[in-house]
């Protein structure tokens, strides 16, 4: 449900200002006078590119989560098999097989822990990317509103009235609202990042322990 919600929420991409100034009304003004507008439009383009990047990353990590879920199921199956082999060795009072089976169980348990830690990390990473995508989308809307505000301020300064209902204060209010939403979304994503990094470190530690135990077990078999 969480995955579907994020895809629906972010699928449309981008965002736009609530109020707009007709570019034709500013056509007679110089490029230099429009520098503030161009700067905001450039920021919007960068934010849109960032949004598209997060959207692609979300799809990739979503796939990685599915793969990791399957790896966890495989690890659990290997542990169940190792436990059954150990039980069989105990029932047959086979000391050598029991010792080997106990070692297999210990290795398989570490495999389950590593697989579980990987799923936990990737799900947390997916959530962070979703939040970052949301922030980037709101950044697009904020930059677009700023571009329109720059147009409105320039029109006002030059005594230009693009339409009868033209009110620069409405542009300012729209920009401030979108800037607040972007800032809140950005902070939400930033607050989540340390937890993602922590989960990754936990996974790496568990994976290293599993790899080492598996290597030791293979050495003892030979």
Residue ranges, per PLM feature:
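Sec-dependent bacterial lipoprotein signal peptides
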Residues: 1-13
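Bacterial Sec signal peptide processing site at the extreme N-terminus
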Residues: 12-31
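Sequence-pattern detector for short linear motifs
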Residues: 5-6, 37, 47, 86, ...
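C-terminal amphipathic alpha-helix
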Residues: 168-222
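N-terminal targeting signals for Sec/Tat export/insertion, comprising classic cleavable signal peptides
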Residues: 31-47
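Extended alpha-helical stalk/coiled-coil segments
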Residues: 42-77, 81-84, 180, 187, ...
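Extended alpha-helical coiled-coil "stalk/arm" regions
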Residues: 61-172
